């Protein structure tokens, strides 16, 4: 514990680099990535878990195989696609890349949670007159809350910490995310360890805060499932 705590390094870090604006960019990208990933992965994972068709098995195989290839191999095709869509140097384009990156693992995780939901609950809802959409939203999704929270956490942390794609796809300084701006502390004369360390420490706080926000949902959902079983 330092004998004389001071915020001088924090003030110096904010004075040297636009950390606040970069953190806002990262927060917008991470929240959008988490939201879109959950919205896409939840119904897809439900279909993969409940319908044992060839298409569902093919989708499951694609999820497994896609994890075997380094995502960096796709940077050139992604760059060309985003260039054609005029999404280079755009936070929207970066969100699309992160969603594509997060989806395979999110599908795999949520499909496992969906398989653990008893089919009898959905059958009971169908007997009561609920359709598939109503059953999904009113019965299945609440039981998938722990998996959805874990998926959102994974997508958020992935987007918040990612550096390579943000470096390649974002050129304008006012659109750069926090991991990219942190590298600006590195100069020809070395790294000013005090302000750089303070900035790096502050960069970890949003991920910890998001985890603290969703961890109760994850824990309570797991305990609820254990009691029901």
From Swiss-Prot:
Function: May participate in oleandomycin secretion during antibiotic production.
Domain ABC transmembrane type-1 residues, every copy: 23-214
Organism from which the protein derives: Streptomyces antibioticus
Name listed for the protein in its UniProt record: Putative ABC transporter permease protein ORF1
GO biological process: transmembrane transport
Record field: transmembrane: 27-47, 62-82, 91-111, 150-170, 194-214
Keywords carried by this UniProt record: Cell membrane, Membrane, Transmembrane, Transmembrane helix, Transport
UniProt topology in membrane: Multi-pass membrane protein
Subcellular localization, as worded in the UniProt entry: Cell membrane
Similarity remark: Belongs to the binding-protein-dependent transport system permease family. MalFG subfamily.
InterPro entries membership: BP-dep_ABC_trans_perm (IPR050901), MetI-like (IPR000515), MetI-like_sf (IPR035906)
Entries under PANTHER family matching the protein: INNER MEMBRANE ABC TRANSPORTER PERMEASE PROTEIN YCJP (PTHR32243:SF18), MALTOSE TRANSPORT SYSTEM PERMEASE-RELATED (PTHR32243)
Lineage, opening ranks: Bacteria, Bacillati, Actinomycetota, Actinomycetes, Kitasatosporales
Source organism, top-level taxon: Bacteria
Entry's Gene Ontology cellular component terms: plasma membrane
């Amino acid at each position: 514990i330092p004998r004389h705590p001071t915020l001088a390094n924090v003030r110096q870090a904010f004075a040297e680099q636009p950390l606040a604006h970069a953190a806002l960019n990262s927060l917008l990208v991470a929240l959008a990535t988490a939201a879109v990933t959950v919205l896409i992965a939840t119904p897809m994972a439900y279909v993969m878990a409940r319908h044992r068709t060839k298409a569902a098995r093919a989708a499951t195989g694609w999820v497994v195989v896609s994890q075997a290839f380094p995502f960096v191999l796709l940077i050139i095709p992604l760059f060309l696609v985003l260039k054609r869509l005029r999404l280079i140097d755009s936070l929207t384009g970066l969100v699309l890349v992160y969603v594509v990156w997060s989806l395979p693992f999110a599908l795999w995780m949520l499909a496992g949670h969906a398989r653990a939901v008893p089919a009898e609950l959905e059958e009971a809802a169908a007997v009561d007159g609920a359709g598939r959409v109503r059953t999904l939203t009113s019965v299945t999704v609440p039981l998938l809350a722990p998996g959805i929270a874990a998926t959102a956490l994974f997508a958020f942390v992935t987007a918040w910490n990612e550096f390579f794609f943000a470096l390649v796809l974002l050129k304008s300084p006012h659109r750069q995310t926090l991991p990219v701006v942190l590298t600006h502390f590195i100069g020809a004369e070395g790294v000013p360890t005090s302000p750089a360390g303070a900035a790096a420490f502050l960069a970890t706080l949003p991920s910890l805060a998001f985890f603290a926000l969703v961890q109760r949902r994850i824990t309570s959902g797991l305990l609820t499932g254990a009691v029901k079983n």
